[in-house]
Amino acid sequence: MVLKFKLNKEQERAFQIVANHSIFPHQDQLKMYLGGMGGTGKSRVLAALSDFFALQKEAHRFVIVAPTGSAAALLGGSTYHSMFGINDFNSNAQLSKVKANLAGVEYVFFDEVSMLSARDLYRISNQLSKVLNSPEDSFGGLNMVFSGDFAQLPPAVGGEGVSLYSRSIGAIASSMKSQEEAIGKALWHQVTTVVILRQNMRQKIQSTLDNQL
């Protein structure tokens, strides 16, 4: 995979963390953040991971979601709203549909995480725990790989004040909404496996082309 997708050292490290985690049984739940500016190759890591699971004949274990339809379409994934049944009335039929969506799924690649508010993250984790009947585990015990660039695209509603890194969240959690925001922020703090891509692959390609002229 490293050679096929021409991964650099940073990209290879991110790929190996997920690939190795998927191979060895009885691993702790993976909660990972893959960060980096545009052009550093986050999508290339995703492509390598998708191909890895497909070659293992285990594509069902790996799903891709994003906050918007356009972002999801670019990655060949779904919106998290449709995949997880967020914003839908949780009837038995709807919960059964979400459970079917997640049948066999063990890894979720979540792109454009900067667009999530802290409350969004709480609602996602709460829904997954409910659907997968795993109330003790955040995100229903699924392995989560969040990706994005916090220098871009803050939450569409509320901006930086409701973001996962907002300092104002948790100071006073008196209402249900503020409590959910505080839990969401705490969930983000559980994401302790971090790989930041720093090498701009677009600039590298352009420099190579310039040298050939």
Enumerate the predicted regions with their spans.
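Conserved ATP-binding/catalytic motifs of P-loop helicase motor domains
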Residues: M1-L213
